[in-house]
Amino acid sequence: MRTEQADDVLVLENIVRKFSAGETFVTVLKDINLTIKRGEMVAIVGASGSGKSTLMNILGCLDRPSSGRYWISGKKTACLSADELSALRRNHFGFIFQRYHLLSELTALGNVEIPAIYAGCSPQIRKKRAQDLLIRLGMGDRINHRPNQLSGGQQQRVSIARALMNNAEVILADEPTGALDKKSGQEVLRILDELHQEGRTIVIVTHDMQVAERAERIIEISDGEIIADNVAKVAKTKAKGQALQGKQNPKNQKTLGFFRSFAERFREAFVMALLAMNAHRMRTFLTMLGVIIGIAAIIAMVALGTGTREKILENFKSLGSNTLTILPGKSLSDPQSDKITSLVEADAEALSRLPYVSGVTPQVSASSTVRFGAVEVDAVIVGVGEQFFQTQGLNAVQGRLFDQKSVRDRAVDLVIEKEALSVLFPHSRESPVGKVVQVGQVPARIVGVIDQQHNGGMSNTLQVYLPYTTVQTRFVGTTQVRAITVKIADDIDSHLAESMVRRFLIMRHGEEDFFIRNSQLFRDRIMESTHILTLLVSSIAAISLIVGGIGVMNIMLVTVSERINEIGVRMAVGARQSDILQQFLIEAILVCIIGGGVGILFGLSIGGLFVLFEAPIHLIYTIDSIIISLTFSTLIGICFGFSPARQASRLDPVVALSRD
């Protein structure tokens, strides 16, 4: 049973550490029992492979023993979670490494501040303390220098300042002079002596007996066993109770609350992500490229689908919206339709009196020619009522449209399409209104010009319009009508109106010798087809975005592999698993968000090209598609960045630190 002493800071009992080697295990530490008291300066000495570094890793909670028990200031570590061990490292230990392990993207000041960020220290306090520590260690003129601008001795001093940032009570120094020249090594040992004099517990791991002799106590280890534990000299530290009570102890300073601390760590992760992206600009751009292309394709395809739909709707207006067209026969392909004579002008008059009908026009047609001077063209002569133009949404851009009087008097008032001007009057800039043209054998006066083609541009045949009574008497020689167009009131459902019109005409004719074409049904089918086509093309674009996301994941896996040493350093100074996860997840999300933003701009620029080259269809962008695309790119970053980030957060600190 262990008897706890008040000044025991590190206590190991029966510690064993084994590593697997294929199907066998190698025992590196064998039944280690060791107690280090508060304020001691201890040197652990041994040859390479003796197990001294493994022992230091267990002392610093960078590694877990295979068996045995370990207490830190009376707290048992065996059942602690990864984040609880991080808290112990953050609050109790400061690490000085042989290879310094400074982050190349940060200045000396930034490297020293890292432990305080994870401790939740406010920016002002941690910056002041980091500056004071660097000045104290003779680095005041190198505060803003990066590691590659510092000598080995200067880098080790920055490492010592980082170890002191959270006022650690235990300093663990692994071969602190191993990579330094003699003068720099002596300077580092002098600093460690000063820290010991302040009352800190110093543990030095070394193979150099001259370095070990600076300690009060020398522990020799060989083949994983302690073979000697000698007191070299009497401690000359501050009296117990005075150690580590300096006014600069950040634990005695005001720290940030949970949310502000989280926000500060998030800000640090964001800055580090930007620095990492800037350090590998070409790789970052190539990673973004897949996201850029995917987002641009989605934005452009959705805009193209919207533009196509609007163009179709624009053309569809010329065919009449919310209208019913009644035709003789069972269908357009009915061979008996020409023999059906029951559709007459009286049907149109009866339909016009229905309360849900806002306009009715009979319709007849004939093929003929239109001639003006030496110009003669084939044309379709369409006979319509005065309400035809209203039902079809057509307006006069010149002159007027014929009225009820023109229909009643069988006038030869002709209305032509605007597109017909360049055909009939190719060299004239005068208004055609009032001019007489020859329609077949009938002279007709042009009274108006309508603004768009009734056939929606789907036929090259010229169409001209006369009162249907005129066409009946002068062109077809019959009083029958070939179609009746019914305009439904705006507040009435066209499908309901269709069923009521069908019942009404069946009652009049005694049978269903007609069929009805509902413009709304035609419109719905066109919209459905357009929507399906847009979804299909957008799905293909989305696949390219997913491929881009896979590229992000691949690069993030490479990034984790390249920065594995950085991960170990951050964990050693107290970063939680969630901090590491956040660090790399933010980087992946940032790549995708920036790529998404550039992709949106690229997608918008495609619309400019359509305008520049006067394409018949313009891309129509919506704020919804832009927001959805940006959200989708963010989700790509989260989904494809989570696995590499999680892999990074679950690394063992000792494994990460051992990688070059």
UniProtKB/Swiss-Prot annotation:
How does the UniProt record describe the way this protein sits in the membrane? Multi-pass membrane protein
Keywords on this record? Antibiotic resistance, ATP-binding, Cell inner membrane, Cell membrane, Membrane, Nucleotide-binding, Translocase, Transmembrane, Transmembrane helix, Transport
The ABC transporter domain, residue ranges: 10-248
The record ties this protein, via SUPFAM superfamilies, to:
P-loop containing nucleoside triphosphate hydrolases
GO BP: any one term: response to antibiotic
Enumerate the residues binding ATP.
Answer: 46-53
The gene coding this protein? macB
Q: Which family does it belong to?
A: Belongs to the ABC transporter superfamily. Macrolide exporter (TC 3.A.1.122) family.
Matching SMART domains, A to Z? Answer: AAA (SM00382)
Give one Pfam family. Answer: MacB_PCD
Major subcellular location class = membrane
User: EC number(s)?
Assistant: 7.6.2.-
This protein's assembly is summarised as:
Homodimer.
One GO MF annotation is: ATP hydrolysis activity
Where is the protein situated, by its record's location annotation?
Answer: Cell inner membrane
Key word Heme present in the record? no
- What GO cellular component is one of the record's annotations? plasma membrane
Parts of the chain that traverse the membrane: 285-305, 532-552, 593-613, 625-645
Q: Which organism is it from?
A: Bartonella quintana (strain Toulouse)
Name the chain's protein.
Answer: Macrolide export ATP-binding/permease protein MacB
Please indicate which superkingdom the organism of origin belongs to. Answer: Bacteria
**Function summary:** Non-canonical ABC transporter that contains transmembrane domains (TMD), which form a pore in the inner membrane, and an ATP-binding domain (NBD), which is responsible for energy generation. Confers resistance against macrolides.
